[in-house]
Amino acid sequence: MPRKKSAAKKAREALVQKKVINSNVPTDKKSIDQLQENVTSKSHLLEESSSEDEEINSFQINEEYAKRFEHNKKREELQKLEAKYGEQMANGVDGEGSDESSSEEEEDSDGELVTPEVDAAILRMIVKIRNKDPDLYDSQQKYFDEVEKDVQGSLKSKDGFRSVTLKDYHRQKLLSGEILDAEEDEPMPNDANPTHVEEQERLRKETIAAFHDVNGNKDAVSNESDEDGDFLVKKEKTKKQLEEEEHGYERFLLESAQSKEARKVLEDLSSSYVKQRPSVLVNTEDDENGIKPSDEDFLLKYMMNRGWRTSNTKQPSYEEIIDEVDAENRFDEDAEEFENKFNFRFEEEAGSQIVSHPRNVADSLRRKDDSRKRARDRKKERLEEASQKRLEEVNRLKNLKRKELEEKLNQVIEIAGSKNIDVSKLDLDEDFDPEKWESKMSEIFNENYYEEDSAKKPEFGDDIDIDDIAQVDNGSEDLGSIENKTVEDTGNREKSKKSLRKDIREKKRKIDEYVEEKYGVPEAVIVKNSKFRYQQVAPETFGLDILDILNASDADLNNYVGLKKMTPYRTPEEIARDKKKYGKKKRLREWKKQVFGK
């Protein structure tokens, strides 16, 4: 398969052909053939040259030069970093470590770095200022350079001192073997009970110690009391020790002053020398400025005794300790509250609570829309009016029926001629049935009716029988008997009135019962379109107790008493019959034995 020409070769061939065509060459066949041979030979030369170019383009990496270049690059980068961050990066100390070391440095709030030399230099400068020394006006004069160098040297020496921790101390003791030797020297503890002699010796020592405690002499048992554990007792300082501490720094300055000049200045300014001779700081301008010697002594005492330092000799009271603890707790609470407010400053207040609003807002301008409520009220009023109207119509119907029935019954009683007729058996509005009518008539007009009719007293006319009157006038009865008869007649009349009223009430009651039964309207018809009302049903267990009902299954209960026996529409006679039938104790015992096995 022939090799395809590249784009560069095609471009070169096209360029050569273009030059050949543009040149003044002959157009005969021989010359053209020669020209083609030249072109092919040149194309072969171009192919050879391109292959040589490809060999030249394939290069190799010089490893020695690459190593030297990388080494120089690293040195250049190292120099840049050292110039930017200093020598700390070269020594392996980064900026964070320096920050931590600087943050760990405590602030010199008590002036611990103020050495005696520094105090001497300060006091020397005060003397020169008060005396207006001309050297102060020399700008090249430096007073604190040497002192600062000494302080820096002392700081470096302190930094160079390596603190020994408890862990290092124990490691050193273990390596030296001192702890092992001490353990070997210690006697082995006696776990057994003490002997009688040891017990007596211990009791004797306790008695002696108690005797010395009573007499106030505790020196004899000081060693034993120390062994009891009360050896960490704070030592109370005497008045002399407090005075020595107060003036101790003054003596410390005098003892620790290294240069003779500093010692001389401190001796001159010492409070002990101030009492013996006039002060060195005396100036004629003090009297003019109102400066008193007492003020000068106060200044010297303040400087010499380090008055700016707080005294720790005073023991805080219980109230002060409690107040300090409370103050710390309040500070922590305030800090926590501030932090919470700051962290949640963009959140809404009470965001976790659901905001509720009242249904009836007093100050709201919203128009009340209670049209549906008013419609319900109107409907309720219409129903109540209709129910009241229906009830009035029923009552009017009852009254009319009562009057009509009374007229009919009065007519029947008047025709029958007897007041003891049972009118409750009569139904004057029902359809006429000859057989029922005959049976009711036979019940009403029975033997009692005819016996009452025969026993009825005869009625007399308006004519008066003279014979009867003559017999009364001519009789032998006295006035007492006549009065007794009059009283009896009066009592009979009262009884007849009572019986008459009783008959009227009984008649009215029977008529009302009859009208209510025949023409009475039930309450459900009167109160129409009302809500459903449950019917009150008397509870009945048929001899079962609560545990039997709860423990038994529905099938067992239905087997004992069916649900049909619990319907509310059953008549009282049916309820009484079922209660008598299903409430028998024998049947209940058999059912319990069958269900519960007892």
UniProtKB/Swiss-Prot annotation:
Subcellular location per the Swiss-Prot or TrEMBL entry: Nucleus, Nucleolus
Basic and acidic residues bias locations: 364-384
Compositionally biased tracts (Acidic residues): 96-111
Example GO BP: endonucleolytic cleavage in ITS1 to separate SSU-rRNA from 5.8S rRNA and LSU-rRNA from tricistronic rRNA transcript (SSU-rRNA, 5.8S rRNA, LSU-rRNA)
Keywords: Nucleus, Phosphoprotein, Ribosome biogenesis, rRNA processing
The keyword Nucleus is assigned to this record: yes
The keyword Isomerase appears for this protein: no
GO CC, one annotated term: nucleus
Region Disordered, residue ranges: 1-36, 83-117, 177-200, 353-384
InterPro entries: Kri1 (IPR018034), Kri1-like_C (IPR024626)
Sites bearing Phosphoserine, chain numbering: 222, 225, 476
Main location: nucleus
Domain of life the protein comes from: Eukaryota
Family: Belongs to the KRI1 family.
Function in brief: Required for 40S ribosome biogenesis. Involved in nucleolar processing of pre-18S ribosomal RNA.
Protein name in UniProt: Protein kri1
Organism field: Schizosaccharomyces pombe (strain 972 / ATCC 24843)
